[in-house]
From Swiss-Prot:
It catalyses: a plastoquinone + NADH + (n+1) H(+)(in) = a plastoquinol + NAD(+) + n H(+)(out); a plastoquinone + NADPH + (n+1) H(+)(in) = a plastoquinol + NADP(+) + n H(+)(out). It comes from Coelogyne cristata (Orchid). The chain crosses the membrane at residues 24-44, 59-79, 99-119, 124-144, 149-169, 184-204, 229-249, 295-315, 323-343, 354-374, 395-415, 418-438. GO terms for molecular function: NADH dehydrogenase (ubiquinone) activity; quinone binding. It is an enzyme of class 7 (translocase). GO terms for biological process: ATP synthesis coupled electron transport; photosynthesis, light reaction. It is found in: Plastid, Chloroplast thylakoid membrane. Its main location: plastid. This is NAD(P)H-quinone oxidoreductase subunit 2, chloroplastic. GO terms for cellular component: chloroplast thylakoid membrane. It holds the Pfam family Proton_antipo_M. NDH shuttles electrons from NAD(P)H:plastoquinone, via FMN and iron-sulfur (Fe-S) centers, to quinones in the photosynthetic chain and possibly in a chloroplast respiratory chain. The immediate electron acceptor for the enzyme in this species is believed to be plastoquinone. Couples the redox reaction to proton translocation, and thus conserves the redox energy in a proton gradient.
Length: 510
């Protein structure tokens, strides 16, 4: 009898939960339609995996890529619609959030073809890899639109858990296991600090969790200038700092970049920064509206440390992946300038524009590393010497992406940095911009050093890795070259094409 009553209660509770979920999807599903497409793609992947054999592997890539492209299409159709807050205040849809969601989807779309040959050569489990990539993308998209403290905490955890699993995907690799352990421990610690800061905001605002309501709550409780706000600001900065990986929160970055599978590093190097930048912009600009001087100072310190340490330490690296890890630390310093400037002087527009170019430059470089690594088994910088004599296309692609990362004209990276630094200069950030210009010159040096090695033709400098290098016989069928070509073209577009990009980026007020 007791069992019968408990069973009935369980069925009733399950029915209520299902009906509530159905009600939310029915009345709010249109507001998260791009995310719903990814969810259906995930379900379809699981269904096909449970009923198929190895012959259906190409379908997994097709379903994943199609889901991402359809999500991008859904975002385009929703562009310029009125801002909407849905799911009882948990999620906000506006142009600002959508452009960051587009950047995340673009990263994932380019990373999947970049991973195909790597997965086949290393015999990694394809379904789990694609599931983790799509789920991480989903977490990043929800983080971009997060409008309350709970979603701001849960969404990055969804992304982080998939990131930990992806970084440790090659279980037999000792370096991968070590990198995953460091990543997991530091990620857990940073999440604890982040939720500590969020709890301070919750308490000081009188129990509010929505971002705009927190501002109203702080005004009502008169706590917007209290010491507790400073504690919340520092804690949240540390928590978000781990995701952005500026100095001094960068300790995990070089080890994870070096130890993780290269396609995973390519994915994490851009998506985590895009999602964290969107979240940081909203958190600092809305709940900490009354503490703008304090968070500006904090971010200025992080930007200076990142630009100096990232570029100086990159000079001494012998591994391509570690060099790009420290380079990314310097790059995030430039992005922080846009966050500090804010919307008054097109700071957000310059940040979005530079981030779009950074995606193409960075993924293009990683595509070259994946291609070279699969054919030689190394990512040591010295082993790239003389690559131009064996594979001119790969060498030129690497050179163009590296030059664009360095900011040499007339490549896209130059115009991105020029616009970013110009906005910073107009906002009065003279010292920050000066540091940015000097460190950009330093970065050009170590990028040119690699390019010199790529183009050398002296036999005594060419290593056995390049001497025994074999080009892909069917380049048109190689998916890595597809991603590489797209990224190289996007990294080298002339300045005349900047106007439409800037026009879209400037229309991102939230």
């Amino acid at each position: 009898m007791i069992w019968h009553v408990q069973n009935e209660n369980f069925i009733l509770d399950s029915t209520r939960i299902f009906m509530k979920a159905f009600h939310l999807l029915l009345f709010h599903g249109s507001f998260i339609f791009p995310e719903c497409i990814l969810i259906f793609g995930l379900i379809l992947l699981l269904m096909i995996d449970s009923t198929s054999d190895q012959k259906d592997r190409p379908w997994f890539y097709f379903i994943s890529s199609t889901s991402l492209v359809m999500s991008i299409t859904a975002l385009f159709f929703r562009w310029r619609e009125e801002p909407i807050i849905s799911f009882s205040g948990n999620f906000q849809t506006n142009n600002f959030n959508e452009i960051f969601q587009f950047l995340i989807l673009l990263c994932s779309t380019l990373c999947i073809p970049l991973s195909v040959e790597y997965i086949e050569c290393t015999e990694m489990a394809i379904t789990e890899f694609l599931l983790f990539v799509l789920t991480a993308t989903l977490g990043g998209m929800f983080l971009c639109g997060a409008n309350d403290l709970i979603t701001i905490f849960v969404a990055p955890e969804c992304f982080s858990l998939c990131s930990y699993l992806l970084s440790g995907y090659t279980k037999r690799d000792v370096r991968s296991n070590e990198a995953t352990t460091k990543y997991l421990l530091m990620g857990g610690a940073s999440s604890s600090i982040l939720v500590h800061g969020l709890s301070w905001l919750y308490g000081l605002s009188g129990g509010e969790i929505e971002l705009q309501e927190i501002v109203n709550g702080l005004i009502n409780t008169q706590m917007y200038n209290s010491p507790g706000i400073s504690i919340a600001l520092i804690s949240i900065t540390v928590g978000i700092g781990f995701k952005l990986s500026p100095a001094p929160f960068h300790q995990w970055t070089p080890d994870v970049y070096e130890g993780s599978p290269t396609p995973v590093v390519a994915f994490l190097s851009v998506t985590s920064k895009v999602a964290a930048s969107a979240s940081a912009t909203r958190i600092f600009d809305i709940p900490f509206y009354f503490s703008s001087t304090e968070w500006h100072l904090l971010l200025e310190i992080l930007a200076i440390l990142s630009m100096i340490l990232g570029n100086l330490i990159a000079l001494t690296q012998t591994s391509m992946k570690r060099m790009l890890a420290y380079s990314s630390i310097g790059q995030i310093g430039y992005v922080i300038i846009g966050i500090i400037v804010g919307d008054s002087n097109d700071g957000y527009a310059s940040m979005i524009t530079y981030m779009l170019f950074y995606i193409s430059m960075n993924l293009g470089t990683f595509a070259c590393i994946v291609s070279f690594g699969l054919r030689t088994g190394t990512d040591n910088i010295r082993d790239y010497a003389g690559l131009y004599t064996k594979d001119p296309f790969l060498a030129l692609s690497s050179a163009l992406c590296l030059l664009s990362l360095g900011g040499l004209p007339p490549l896209a990276g130059f115009f991105g940095k020029l616009y970013l630094f110009w906005c910073g200069w107009q906002a009065g950030l003279y010292f920050l911009v000066s540091i940015g210009l000097l460190t950009s010159v330093v970065s050009i040096y170590y990028y040119l050093k690699i390019i010199k090695l790529l183009m050398t033709g002296r036999n005594q400098e060419i290593t056995p890795h390049v001497r025994n290098y074999r080009r892909s016989p069917l380049r048109s069928n190689n998916s890595i070259e597809l991603s590489m070509t797209v990224c190289v073209i996007a990294s080298t577009i002339p300045g005349i094409s900047m106007n439409p990009i800037l026009a879209i980026a400037q229309d991102t007020l939230f």
